[in-house]
Structure formats: structure tokens, C-alpha cells
Regions:
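C-terminal alpha-helix
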Residues: 135-143
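A glycine- and Lys/Arg-enriched "phosphate-lid" helix/loop adjacent to the NTP-binding pocket
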Residues: 54-126, 135
Length: 146
């Protein structure tokens, strides 16, 4: 539990580094005059909400410093993946049982319902999920670029 804030700090530094490099790119031969007038979207697979949910799921609590950081950060769109695909083992995944997966999914959904930013549930087979994700991102970024 004590390591979670250290992990959260690393997450914040990583996000800020990526966003800063996108907003202030270095000149190159292909792009001699970088501009932040039309920045590209940044996709973040894991953010502080994942640390919060995991902490609450495993330890039944979350460090207040993490909650404060969540309240102070802004994200424009979340894609919440449903658990309707079979579980596939890899070195980062835990909880192969359906009951735990359902419980975690509801933790994430409850978190998103109680936030003030848009989110889209992604479900279906792999192709349907990809298309839903593309559609959700396009609906968000295309009106901003007009």
C-alpha cells in the first residue's frame, strides 16, 4: 500500500513528460517550426484512477494524496472496456475469475459515473471495440479541429 503513492508520482511525471513534449516539440528537419496550435491526442492506458480503483479493491482504501491528484487532473475522454471478452493471461493481469472482474469493472464504472468528463463503454468483439474506440475519439476531436 505504501508504494502506491510512489507509483502515482511516476505516473504523473510520465504523463506530464509526454504532454509537455507534445505541446512543445523540438524543431526537426521535417518540422522546422513546431506548433502547439493543433496538438495530437495523447492516449494514456493507465492513470491515477487505475491506482485508486486497484487500491480500493485490494486494500479497501486509497491514499488521500492520490485522491487529491485525481481531483486536480483533467482528462478529456475515458474509454471503459467491458469484461465481455474472455480473460487472457499475461504478466500484468490478475483476477481471472469472473466475479472479481465484474467487481473491478463496477469500481471503474462507478468512478466514471461520478466524474465530470465524458466516457464511453467499449464492448463487443475485437473489431467492434476498435471501431467504438475510434468513433468515440473522433466524436471528441473532430469538432475541436473545425
Amino acid at each position: 500500500y505504501e508504494d502506491l503513492y510512489t507509483i502515482a508520482e511516476g505516473q504523473i511525471k510520465g504523463e506530464e513528460s509526454i504532454i509537455n513534449s507534445m505541446m512543445h516539440p523540438k524543431p526537426s528537419t521535417l518540422n522546422p517550426q513546431p506548433s502547439s496550435l493543433n496538438p495530437q491526442p495523447v492516449f494514456i492506458d493507465t492513470d491515477l484512477s487505475v491506482i485508486k480503483v486497484w487500491s480500493e479493491f485490494v486494500f479497501n482504501k486509497c491514499d488521500n494524496s492520490i485522491l487529491t491528484q485525481i481531483a486536480n487532473r483533467t482528462y478529456h475522454l475515458y474509454l471503459l472496456c467491458n469484461i465481455d471478452l474472455p480473460w487472457v493471461k499475461d504478466e500484468l493481469r490478475e483476477y481471472p475469475d469472473l466475479e472479481s472482474r465484474e467487481k473491478l469493472y463496477h469500481y471503474y464504472k462507478d468512478f466514471l459515473i461520478n466524474q465530470h468528463f465524458p466516457w464511453v463503454e467499449i464492448s463487443g468483439n475485437y473489431e467492434e471495440r476498435l471501431q467504438k474506440g475510434i468513433d468515440a475519439v473522433n466524436q471528441f476531436i473532430l469538432p475541436q479541429r473545425r
